[in-house]
Amino acid sequence: MTEELDLWRLAAGLGLFLFGMHQLEQALTQLAGRSFKKFLRQYTAKPVRGVIAGALSTAALQSSSVVSLIVLAFVGTGIVSLASALGIVFGSNLGTTMTGWIVATIGFKLDIEALALPLITLGGFGVVWSAAGTRRSGVSHFVVGLGLMLMGLEFMKSGALIATELFDPAALAGYPLIAFLVAGLLLTAVIQSSSATIMITLSALYAGAIPLEAAAATAIGADLGTTITAVLGALAGSAAKKRVAAAVVLFNVVADTIAFVSLKPLIHFITKIIGLADPLFALVAFHSLFNLIGILIFLPTIPLLSRWLDRRFREDETPLLRHIKPGDTAVPEAALENMTRETWRLIDQAVALN
C-alpha cells in the first residue's frame, strides 16, 4: 500500500507540474502578445540571431512548442526564412535547459512548499477576480502556474526520497546507460514534455536513486523523445512543417548521439575540470553543454541544410490559395499577413486577365 501511495505521489507531482507548465505557457503567451512575435520577426534576419532569439524566447516562455508553433506559421507566410527558422528552433533546444537551471538553483535548496502555497493562493484569487483576457488575468495565471509547478516538483522530490527507502539504488548500477536513454525517450514521448522528464530525473538524482551518468543518459533520451512529437505533428502537415520537423530530428539525433558517445568525458570535464561537484548542477550543465555543441556543429550548415530541405520537401500540388494556410489562425499576425498577400495576388491576376 505504501508503494502505491508513493507512486501516486510521484504521478500527482508530475500532473501538477505539467498543468502548472501549461498555465505558465498560456499566461506568458498572452502577456508577451504582439511584442514577442514582433521580436521574432525583426531579430531573426540571420541564423546566428535566430539561435539567440530562439534561446531567449524559449527561456522566457518556458515552452519550445509555443515558439515552434509561431515559427512554423511565420515560415508558412514567408515572414521568416527557413534558414532563420532553423536557427530559432536550434536555439530553442538550448532555451529549454533554462528550466533545469532554475529548478536546480532554487527547487532543491529552498522550502518549495512554503513558496508554492502563497503563489497558488494569490494566483487563484487573482484568476477568479480578474476578467478573462486582461493583463491582470494573465499575471494571475502566471503566478498560479508557477505555484503549481513548484508544488508538483515538491511532490516528485518527496515521492522520490520515500521511494529510495523501498529499494536499494545500487541495484540500478547493473543496467547499461542505453537503458536509461530509452527510458527517458519513452517517458518524454508519453508525457509530451522533455522538461517534465528532466524534473523527474533531477528528483531521482537528488534522492540518490540514480547515479549522475544514468541521469545524463536519461536527459539525452528526453531530448530524443521530443523528436517523436515533431515527427507525429508533421506527418500530415505542410511542406514547411515537414522541413522544420526534419531539421529538429536531424539536430537532436546528431547532438544526442555525440552526447551519448562522449558522455563520460563530458561528465568528467564538468565535474573535475570545471569543478561542478553538485550532481544537480552537473546534470543541467551537461544538458546545456551538449545542446550548445549541437548548435555549434549545425550553425555553419544552416544555409546548406535549408536549401536541401527545400528540395527534399516540396508542395505536392499548387493550391488554389497560395498564401493562406489552414493553421494560420493560431498566429493572428501571420493570418493577417497571409490575407494581405493573397488579396494582392488575386488583384494582380484579375488585372492580368483584363
Question: What does each model-found stretch correspond to?
Answer:
Residues 111-113, 121-184, 250-254, 283-295:
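Core mid-bundle transmembrane helix pairs that form the ion/substrate translocation pathway
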